[in-house]
Amino acid sequence: MLHKRASEANDKNDNTIIGSDLASSKKRRIDFTESSSDKSSSILASGSSRGFHGDSVVQQIDMAFGNSNRQEIDEDLHSRQLAVYGRETMRRLFASNVLISGMHGLGAEIAKNLILAGVKSVTLHDERVVELWDLSSNFVFSEDDVGKNRADASVQKLQDLNNAVVVSSLTKSLNKEDLSGFQVVVFSDISMERAIEFDDYCHSHQPPIAFVKADVRGLFGSVFCDFGPEFAVLDVDGEEPHTGIIASISNENQAFISCVDDERLEFEDGDLVVFSEVEGMTELNDGKPRKIKSTRPYSFTLDEDTTNYGTYVKGGIVTQVKQPKLLNFKPLREALKDPGDFLFSDFSKFDRPPLLHLAFQALDHFKAEAGRFPVAGSEEDAQKLISIATAINTGQGDLKVENVDQKLLRHFSFGAKAVLNPMAAMFGGIVGQEVVKACSGKFHPLFQFFYFDSVESLPSEPVDSSDFAPRNSRYDAQISVFGAKFQKKLEDAKVFTVGSGALGCEFLKNLALMGVSCGSQGKLTVTDDDIIEKSNLSRQFLFRDWNIGQAKSTVAASAAAVINPRFNIEALQNRVGAETENVFDDAFWENLTVVVNALDNVNARLYVDSRCLYFQKPLLESGTLGTKCNTQSVIPHLTENYGASRDPPEKQAPMCTVHSFPHNIDHCLTWARSEFEGLLEKTPAEVNAYLSSPVEYTNSMMSAGDAQARDTLERIVECLEKEKCETFQDCLTWARLRFEDYFVNRVKQLIYTFPEDAATSTGAPFWSAPKRFPRPLQYSSSDPSLLNFITATAILRAETFGIPIPEWTKNPKEAAEAVDRVIVPDFEPRQDAKIVTDEKATTLTTASVDDAAVIDDLIAKIDQCRHNLSPDFRMKPIQFEKDDDTNYHMDVIAGLANMRARNYSIPEVDKLKAKFIAGRIIPAIATSTAMATGLVCLELYKVLDGGHKVEAYRNTFANLALPLFSMAEPLPPKVVKHRDMAWTVWDRWVLKGNPTLREVLQWLEDKGLSAYSISCGSCLLFNSMFTRHKERMDKKVVDLARDVAKVELPPYRNHLDVVVACEDEDDNDVDIPLVSIYFR
């Protein structure tokens, strides 16, 4: 879910979609041999319960895809994708050659997603030439390409997406042997006879060649996958192995194991787990996978007799062992007759997949007999296809469809020739992900047929057959499904797209191809206040490397206008929020047809949702997280709004856990980022705030007079007096002493205050799970991780003071000698040290009766420090930037976290994994983004039609890793009833004529409602309990708002909104809609 930003594009942007040289940009690359520890490799170490060994699985993959240990990953470019796939999967992608045959819209979408993902090569095959018809769905074609070979016309524009991928074309007729050089072949425009021939070859090839057949025909789509007789899935879901912290283990046959109630267990019956760090019952620490059963939220049973094992004392971690899975694919020849279980997407269409299995076969027979597709609107062709389907169905035996839905087949026939952009985008995401699975063994493949339709997207009213006729237009394919009149609705739509990141780029491409806002009355406004970064380029495909640093919205708008020059698009660089309501004013919102969100944060979504509620505008919402995506249709008066239901807030670790009792690497990284920001950003910023306005700053601190003010002043004194740095050696000394404080002294103090045998007030062991007893570290310059951390920390400290970095810091020997010169004082434990152990505590700073006096002393000290500084002295606060590997930020944060993890015997992580967690990187890939936008645009057809009932709309949740597709009808809004009236959150009561307070109260009384409170914003305009408020009865409400609430009403605002609290005749509260009082 992505919300991003923008500025002016330069002249290059006129050709943004067609030209790039990613190879020209300087890249930091990491060799796979340095660290290729993917989850799949560790999973396989323990073997499999399915009768094959991990080593053989790896050999199978490596034999199929070759050895590519020399391949490198550009972490800056692929960081979001790495968070989904891991290094090993990326390595296998880099070694994979893919053939895509059929370069209409679906082929182009599949190719785009795979080129962005970074496979080794993509070969585009097509024997046909570009027609104007193709421009409805293929974003790489322009009108100038009409008459050229489709593959040749696609190569350069797709190559520009990623110059690290070799993109080539093939225009001859394929034979089976041509497929031997590929790991995966995808056919999107092929007869069933040829598909069976090619699939037989791929299925029997050694090693097998993964075969994918995909079709989109109008509003219908299908996918078939055959990855060979035995295909190893190394990681079925892509989720991290689940873990638990052990609290007790019984000595009995079928041992009962309980875990701490810190987090619910996610184990399932039959899972294999391994144990570590168990004290007492050490027999379990042998690394052997063990089967569990009777899983509950905080306990499970071990399928093993522990009667004669040692008695459990304490500690222990239990970790799920993810098992490989072997799939036996059937070749297409057999699967057509025995398809097995279909993958469902919409359980309101439970009988649909068998019918579509029949329909696609019937279409193939029709094309073979007629040499063409059925003509849109032709009843004769539709009846012929229905007859063929009926005949096939008669001979299907157990597969026979009980009720051949002729109406559905008629729709299928009418749109069979058309490849629609939303369907191409959706299936391009699905098929692209299946190719990644075939290349890598990562995630569970689609097994084996998937059928989908969105027949609900068709116009709600019947369309005359003449309206389907081609107009010699780039939209003819879409017209053949929806009709020319509906196409006019699309072209005249006024759309607001909020965000132009990954989702936004896909939306703009889709809308341009569909012709949305491309008519004389249409307009699309896109806004985004973000700029383009290198990490965007692997998903946000409208951007090129030369656009880095430019405004997202303007670059995206320029690129979308290249796709369709008729696109009426305006790009803005404003954040959408209360502060920009002068830009996005009432007139702007009232003029809109629909709003399409492409945001990446909940608060922005909620604001846009509130605006759509207020102005009663449809909102199409979507979001992605790795392989997962969701879409929601918010339709005035038909569905609930986005804010009507929310996910529960993420569980936050208690402050005391993060600061003193961490038990996982997330706690360590949370602490590390907090310390980084406190030391290098917040404290220097406080120093500058003080130096800029000493009197005002110290007055505010004295006024606060609390523990937080005391703590802030202490940090300023440390910066300007005790720990002030003037040379780089000072910075190195500071960093070395900071290491000693964090990882030695604080730990010694902690275990002095709470020894290993300490007990709680109830007599229970203090150091019981999930607490882990820490050990202080001992510094040694021979440990490169310690030396690198201290050097990186010193460099950033020097940056805050503007101190030059000497060249010798790059020499480990010289740096070690400089660190060794630092004199480290001996540690003396404090008897009165207070360490917070209360999990409900919200601060680590404790108040004292002496705070005011201490603050006075500190102010005197910093005043003295100020006089010792030059007048222009300022520090340089450092804002954390995760995506620049040369700035030492992640070196410091990863170092802080790993040293702390070492204190508590928590497994450490590499810098990349640390960046994912500490940088709060949202995992993202092109495939799920493409699918989400395709689904949203299928809903857009319904919105712009305007006549659909709620039953026609769909909200979707999908997970391409499993794969899982779950579609459901949106929930209706909650209805409130009073007397003969009813309303929902979509309603707003309007009162015109600039009424007085008395007139408003009377107006409500006429509805049987007694208003006891009226407020505007946070200010109370009227309360029936306050006698003086009765003096306001004859004042205009708008004047009360100006005088009492100090509301400023700009010229573009013609009404005022007030919240009214009411009771009915029985004194029951009644929630009424927002009341809008018009005064102009």
Swiss-Prot record:
The keyword ATP-binding applies. Coiled coil: none annotated. GO terms for biological process: protein ubiquitination; response to other organism. Residues 1-14 have a biased composition (Basic and acidic residues). CDD domains: Ube1_repeat1, Ube1_repeat2. It comes from the Eukaryota. It catalyses: ATP + ubiquitin + [E1 ubiquitin-activating enzyme]-L-cysteine = AMP + diphosphate + S-ubiquitinyl-[E1 ubiquitin-activating enzyme]-L-cysteine. ATP binds at A502, D528, R539, K552, D600, N601. It is an enzyme of class 6 (ligase). Residues 38-49 have a biased composition (Low complexity). Pathway: Protein modification; protein ubiquitination. InterPro entries: E1_4HB, E1_FCCH, E1_FCCH_sf, ThiF/MoeB/HesA, ThiF_NAD_FAD-bd, Ub-activating_enz_E1_C, Ub-E1_IAD_1, UBA_E1_C_sf. Keywords: ATP-binding, Ligase, Nucleotide-binding, Ubl conjugation pathway. Residues 1-20, 29-50 are annotated as: Disordered. GO terms for molecular function: ATP binding; ubiquitin activating enzyme activity; ubiquitin-protein transferase activity. PROSITE patterns: UBIQUITIN_ACTIVAT_1 (PS00536), UBIQUITIN_ACTIVAT_2 (PS00865). Signal peptide: none annotated. The active site is at C656. Expressed in leaves, flowers, roots and stems. Detected in germinating seeds, cotyledons, hypocotyls, vascular tissues, anthers, filaments, pollen, style, stigma, sepals, petals, ovary, developing ovules, funiculi and silique walls. GO terms for cellular component: cytosol; peroxisome; plasmodesma. Pfam families: E1_4HB, E1_FCCH, E1_UFD, ThiF, UBA_E1_SCCH. Activates ubiquitin by first adenylating its C-terminal glycine residue with ATP, and thereafter linking this residue to the side chain of a cysteine residue in E1, yielding a ubiquitin-E1 thioester and free AMP. Both UBA1 and UBA2 are able to activate ubiquitin and transfer it to the E2s with equal efficiency. Monomer. Belongs to the ubiquitin-activating E1 family. This is Ubiquitin-activating enzyme E1 1. It comes from Arabidopsis thaliana.
